[in-house]
Amino acid sequence: MASDRQNLQDAFLNHVRKTKVPVTIFLINGVKLQGVITWFDNFCVLLRRDGQSQLVYKHAISTIMPSQPISLYEGEDAS
């Protein structure tokens, strides 16, 4: 049963990718990146801004902050 559930990280990234919500990504060295997440996997995130793409490795990411409030598992039982 537990394996049927998507982990929080994947659910969050998939939601902001599908809805094209702009995000701010803070790296562990303090750099701030902004754009829209277009793709992700277990190791990296593809961030797009002004027609340019940046491949960002997850181990370098400190925080991902969406530009607007998001609701995960809308309409589903989150328990």
Curated annotation (Swiss-Prot):
- Sorted alphabetically, which HAMAP family does this protein's record hold? Hfq
Q: What does this protein do?
A: RNA chaperone that binds small regulatory RNA (sRNAs) and mRNAs to facilitate mRNA translational regulation in response to envelope stress, environmental stress and changes in metabolite concentrations. Also binds with high specificity to tRNAs.
From which source organism is this entry?
Roseobacter denitrificans (strain ATCC 33942 / OCh 114) (Erythrobacter sp. (strain OCh 114))
Domain Sm, by residue range, is 10-70
Put simply, this protein is called RNA-binding protein Hfq
Query: Which Pfam families has this protein been placed in?
Result: Hfq (PF17209)
Q: Which family does it belong to?
A: Belongs to the Hfq family.
GO cellular component terms attached to this protein's record:
cytosol
Gene Ontology MF: a single term: RNA binding
Q: How does it assemble?
A: Homohexamer.
Ordered alphabetically, the record's keywords are: RNA-binding, Stress response
Its organism's taxonomic lineage begins at: Bacteria, Pseudomonadati, Pseudomonadota, Alphaproteobacteria, Rhodobacterales
